């Protein structure tokens, strides 16, 4: 049996049937330095509260799965070093060995589902890495979306990935890719990509109905909601494309592989955009949190 510890706030919301929104914790441990990481996580939680839902940041602390973090736990995680980055393959071992870890999209979905949380906000999902035809580097997030019934709100897949192949895999796995409010799939920091929206939905209520209908049909898996970054915060794809290509070439030349690829690329893109990529990342995460809260509220009304 997996023992979960709910924060006081999450426990109150759960017992009273209030809408909850799950949040991952790798943005705290692997996304930005202290104290900015804690400040951003606190702001995102506040955005969810302001939008009428309760945030539940998920992490493993000393071998225990936490659904929602108390302020002192958030501080501890934000200041910790050598925190494990947990996906589907790592989560159980971390729990069994008393470890501490931050949850990726896949692990957060698993934990949210066990906690009875149906909606999860993140920045961008993982996917098929460029060059995957030789490296076979494909994120476990895609398989998780195909089997765990959680609606994930993101700004699409991370722009450093092969978006075309990522969308093909999602289609093969039967994952609904719903773009919110536009006809083009967003590219994380950019509102536009070369790819059309597989599905378009224009309201949180319709997304909630789709989630409920999928469960009623007994179709496994969740759905991906691609929420474009606000126009005032985006980095145009024309500016980003050469920067990403240059960073990719540097990584290949340096022989960087596996889990080290994404942090390297994000650091180089941060440097080349003079911090604009991080500012855009914060804006899109906050935007996703607000939409996720609206979906969670709509879903609660459907099931009340």
Residue ranges with predicted function:
Residues 35-41, 73-78, 127-146, 169:
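A glycine- and small-aliphatic-rich helix-loop capping segment at beta-alpha/alpha-beta transitions
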Residues 1-50, 114:
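N-terminal glycine-/serine-/threonine-rich phosphate-binding loop
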Residues 21-23, 56-60, 101, 119-124, ...:
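General beta-strand structural signal in soluble alpha/beta enzymes
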């Amino acid at each position: 049996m997996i023992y979960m510890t709910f924060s006081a706030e999450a426990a109150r919301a759960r017992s009273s049937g209030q809408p909850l929104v799950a949040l991952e914790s790798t943005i705290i441990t692997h996304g930005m330095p202290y104290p900015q990481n804690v400040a951003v996580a606190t702001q995102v939680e506040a955005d969810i509260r302001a939008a009428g839902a309760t945030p539940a940041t998920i992490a493993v602390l000393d071998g225990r799965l936490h659904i929602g973090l108390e302020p002192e736990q958030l501080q501890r995680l934000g200041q910790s070093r050598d925190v494990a980055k947990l996906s589907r393959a790592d989560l159980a071992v971390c729990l069994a060995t008393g470890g501490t870890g931050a949850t990726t999209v896949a692990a957060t979905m698993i934990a949210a589902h066990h906690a009875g949380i149906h909606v999860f906000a993140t920045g961008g999902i993982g996917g098929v890495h460029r060059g995957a035809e030789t490296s076979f580097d494909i994120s476990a997030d895609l398989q998780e979306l195909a089997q765990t019934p959680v609606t994930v709100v993101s700004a699409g897949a991370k722009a450093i990935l092969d978006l075309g192949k990522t969308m093909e895999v999602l289609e093969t796995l039967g994952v609904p890719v719903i773009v919110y409010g536009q006809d083009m799939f967003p590219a994380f920091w950019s509102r536009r990509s070369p790819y059309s929206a597989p599905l378009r939905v224009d309201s949180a209520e319709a997304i909630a109905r789709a989630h409920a209908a999928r469960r009623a049909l007994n179709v496994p898996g969740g759905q991906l909601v691609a929420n474009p970054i606000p126009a005032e915060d985006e980095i145009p794809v024309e500016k980003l494309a050469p920067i990403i290509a240059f960073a990719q070439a540097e990584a290949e030349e340096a022989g960087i592989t596996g889990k080290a690829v994404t942090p390297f690329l994000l650091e180089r893109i941060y440097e080349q955009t003079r911090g604009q990529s991080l500012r855009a990342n914060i804006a899109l995460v906050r935007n996703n949190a607000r939409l996720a809260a609206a979906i969670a509220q709509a879903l609660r009304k459907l099931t009340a």
